[in-house]
């Protein structure tokens, strides 16, 4: 199971961020995702040979233009990440500007090409209907974008709806690795995600990571 631990609390200081990441690293997580300002602080804690250190780009709303987003990706790579989490431009998706979405992805890929950078995209499933989500995932497939988060996890969310959206994308895009985002994970959610075939989950809580590891060892 792919487990991503993410920090989205901008009030979190560097010391606390290090403490949280140190807590989850020993649990064998797959990825750590942080804002740009925490990359250098956290880099020494992540084994880049076996784990992803990723940076949020244009998070959470995806409101910047392509040039700004590409520049942010370039700076994150220079800072030391081996992965980037890109927020889907909501205005493009809402207005079904699929060609513009392709242009945006192409520009991001050009920055990452040859640098062994994993590109992951973040959607906000509540903003788009299923037809739009499916079309966007087809575009991801065409660009060999393999990791998709159906939700930012930034806003108040219904985890059950999130899991339903994740399962829908998984069923319609078998080549994509769907990672479900959520804050409060209970055993019933762990059970649902384990049975669903979804690739993994993202959490913002070290406590959830520990609980999931215990759940897996007990089952």
Q: Can you say where each PLM-predicted feature lies in the sequence?
A:
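Short, electropositive alpha-helical surface patch
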Residues: 110-113, 134-145
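Active-site-adjacent beta->alpha loops and helix N-cap segments on the catalytic face
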Residues: 34-52, 64-68, 91-112, 128-133, ...
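Hydrophobic faces of well-ordered beta-strands that scaffold small-molecule active sites
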Residues: 1-7, 30-34, 51-59, 82-86, ...
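Alpha/beta catalytic cores of nucleotide-metabolism and tRNA/nucleoside-modifying enzymes
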Residues: 1-15, 167-179, 186-219
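Glycine-rich phosphate-binding active-site loops on the catalytic face of alpha/beta enzymes
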Residues: 59-60, 79-93, 142-159, 183-184, ...
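Conserved N-terminal beta1-alpha1 strand-loop-helix module at the mouth
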Residues: 1-78, 135, 139
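Catalytic cores of alpha/beta
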Residues: 64-78, 128-139, 169-180, 184-201
